[in-house]
Amino acid sequence: MRQATRAQWIKCAIAILLYLVFLLWVRSWWGLIVVPFIFDIYITKKIPWSFWKKSKNPAVRSVMSWVDAIVFALVAVYFVNIYIFQNYQIPSSSLEKSLLVGDFLYVSKMSYGPRVPNTPLSMPLAQHTLPVFNTKSYIEWPQWKYKRVPGFGKVKLNDIVVFNFPAGDTVAVNYQQTTDFYTLAYGEGQRIYSKQIEMDSLTRSQQRAIDDLYYDAGRKQILNNPRTYGEVLWRPVDRRENYVKRCVGLPGDTLQIVDGQVMIDGKAIENPENLQFNYFVQTTGPYIPEDMLRELGISKDDTMLIEDSGWEGGLLDMGLDNRNAQGKLNPVYHLPLTKKMYDTLLGNKKLISKIVMEPEEYAGQMYPLNLYTKWNRNNYGPIWIPAKGATITLTEDNLPIYERCIVAYEGNKLEVKPDGIYINGEKTNEYTFKMDYYWMMGDNRHNSADSRYWGFVPEDHVVGKPIVVWLSLDKDRGWFDGKIRWNRLFKWVD
């Protein structure tokens, strides 16, 4: 064996030192078993790591050089994605105009501290499904418990956060892009039992029994009809869909929404500069020019021109009753608008006659799905956000709010019996939370599937913090017609 040079010893020492610093950071001393292999790569060279370089067959050398490069790249990407940063593309308009559809984000894992993966055996760059093959991109065994490596800080109020979708633990594959499993199950159950029940006249226990009936019926409907709903899958925390929203409530806060304004502990919080709501906009007769909509920043997907006569009754109820000489209603658009966009349109008296905010009946069912309330997306709560170590008294009124935290996120067994609440077989009326939770909402308040619909975000679901937009593409434009939004390149996220 050829004696190692001084340079090789120095390289080996630096590599081992950096690796030990990494192990100290992630607090995983199992990784020490790798140290002898690092030593062998630089010094002893007992293992023929580059055996293919000595092959006399040029094809073998060529193929193996590519394999070597690809494996190295995949391993590097794997560790960078887990511990440093990952790329994320904005898929929906829920955070417009703060973040736009087509924005590509640099998401820092260091901001809140990276998580050790729940499913360590997975393919890099694939969240849960391998493209083309349409199979799982991860192996379910082994599964590691939640552990977060120290980072630069914690989630703060008004931070934009990337996280795993909490209600994405169970998915009906054919509906995974539109409706979470639980909302789908309750909706199908209510459709099956179509006779309306006056919940106001029932006790909380009776209401719970009705909600359980809806959910069980809907769940059976989904499981028994895979052709319609697709296969039903369970996903570990780190393999659930990535969502991005703004944190508007921290652990221990009491949150309430009053007329669209978020209140924390009774005080209004600062609204994002580009807060949006949906409106019905009626013109004085002509259509709104496409150039004007483009200049306002309203995408084609968010622009709906209402021409179906079936809408007329609803439009008249909203006071959108301006008609032309032939007696036909003037054109009405359904648009998401910021205050600035609202003022711009309303100020154009020659074109715009009326603007009315979208009524509440256009919203879906609020969280918790199994609690009868009169909450809606603009008037919600109050609701207390769980904090690690905090103890609450459980009642019939608040159990549906915190039941999912207790069972799905913190792994307990909960039963409601005639004589009370049982957790892990023991009767109790208290529970102490093991994790912190957050309340996430989109800036596009009427076009955002957020905590108002599916509840709290547990700390173990937090992925990272978007730092910068490194690329932004407008899907409504061509490459030679402004597809690249140059003014958004390398724009800081706030």
Language-model-detected regions and their locations in the chain:
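Extended hydrophobic leader/signal-anchor segments used for secretion and membrane insertion
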Residues: 1-494
